[in-house]
Amino acid sequence: MNAMRASLTGELGRMTLTRGRLIGYEFDRMVMLFSMVDGQREIPCAISTSAMDDLENLARCQPNQREAQFIRLRDRIEERAARKFAALEFEGNPPGIVLRSIDFQT
């Protein structure tokens, strides 16, 4: 586990995770797909639409407004994705980061 953590973090414990691509809204799963980059490796990520709505205190955003909503919230979303990445909280196949409302509760 320590070797894996070492490969996922940079020198002095700094994460090497940087902004990746905005992939788009997946209606069937009700998630916005995006990626983060660790060196040369792209990390698949997703955030639930309910999490984005909760962040903005909205009842429900329309599907055609999801991309704009993600862009407004992108810094906060990516910060939480980086935290889950540092904690090695991967899900799915291929392993990636999935953000839900609970991930933003303090």
Predicted regions and their residues:
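Short, exposed beta-strand "edge-strand" segments with a Pro/Gly-rich flavor and a Y/T-containing core
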Residues: 21, 39-47, 90-99
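A short, structured beta-strand/loop element
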Residues: 33-58
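Acidic, low-complexity intrinsically disordered segments
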Residues: 2-13, 58-106
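Short, charged/polar N-terminal "headpieces" of proteins
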Residues: 1-36, 41
